[in-house]
Amino acid sequence: MKRIIHFILIALFLIPCCAVQASHQPEFSTAGFFQLPNSGREVFSMNPAWRFYKGAVAGAEAANFNDAEWTVVSLPNGIEYLPTEASGCINYQGEVWYRKHFTPADALKGKKLFLHFEAIMGKSKVFVNGKLLTEHFGGYLPVVVDISDVLNWGEDNVIAVW
């Protein structure tokens, strides 16, 4: 009987602690890019509605490239990373492309604007409107790109990641 009472008392103590922790979870990524009160920084999720193509495609970095037939995915997106027993030790190692169309709000003019990729696996190139902004050669690591000077205001802009 004593054990049951101890268990109930411990449970009653721990339940409010868990509730407090759950209420303080960040609304955005745990990578540090979440909205902070009174910081002046705005955060916009670009994760939904990327165009995806598995394979080599010439000219896919160009803003006017036709990606209408590509698969639509949300990020993060695993290309084809399967467990060894499911893939026969053969995971896809070729080229892939991701493209995102967006029109920036005029209210953002004059501000510093960055793309923050929480992680890109392996070698990659990031283009905005056909212009190569950075190359990444690491493992599954974050990539941050300043896009302030390459946006076309009031028009369709395209991020392309190879």
What residue spans do the PLM features occupy?
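Intrinsically disordered, low-complexity sequence elements enriched in Ser/Thr/Gly/Pro
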Residues: 1, 15, 97-98
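Bacterial N-terminal signal peptides that target proteins for export
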Residues: 1-8
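Bacterial N-terminal signal peptides
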Residues: 8-17
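Accessory carbohydrate-binding/adhesion or oligomerization-edge regions at the termini
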Residues: 19-89, 103, 133, 158-162
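Accessory beta-strand-rich segments of carbohydrate-active enzymes
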Residues: 28, 32-36, 44, 56, ...
